[in-house]
Amino acid sequence: LQRITVSLDALDDVIFRRMNDVDFAVGDVLRGIEMAQQVGLAPVKINMVVKRGTNDGEILPLARYFRHSGAVLRFIEYMPIGDERTSSHCAVDPHAPALNPELWDASDTVPSDELRARINAGAAAAGLGELEPLDINDAPAGAGPARYWHFPGAAGTVGFISAMSNHFCANCNRLRLTADGNVRPCLFSDAEYSVREALRRGDDMQVLSIWRDAVAHKPQEHAIIEGTQRFMSQIGG
């Protein structure tokens, strides 16, 4: 184990507990992050999924908290994982027909450009300067689809994953293996390829064939607004 990713959607205890449905304090997570850094795991990535009206007030507190930590803070646009619709529209559209409003609505998504502008405005007011793009060669290991920025003179890095407002399908290098043994070539598609039985048999050639088949069937572009049947907790992320 060389690096880890931690989901952290708020520093405020009330928001944290409500969003994660847990009975422990956010301080436990923060201590775990510090311990991971102390034992040499690097990079330590912090993923924050931003939902308008729920935790978007936590954007600046998290940016300030991790600014000098050396951790990689990544803001992720809120996405319709675990619901279905028939439209194939891919961009953020507040006028698009809503999915189940208890699960996802287009107006819940805060686009990365808005996130960055809000961070810059808050940073400027605090005299911290503005985010600057990070050279691709300086991006953290396992950077994947995120686009990275940093504050001048700060140890931390800020990334934005913009699946809704500016999809990155052409550069996607991800496959996912679900807990029940299926290879999923695209997070936003329900297409899956079962590798479980081949793994149980120890059939390495069959496993390799299935993985190659999954790679070959990665879609050219996601249809994210269609939603998916599985939730993230079922897919793994």
Predicted regions and their residues:
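Auxiliary Fe-S-binding modules of radical SAM enzymes
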Residues: 64, 68, 78-237
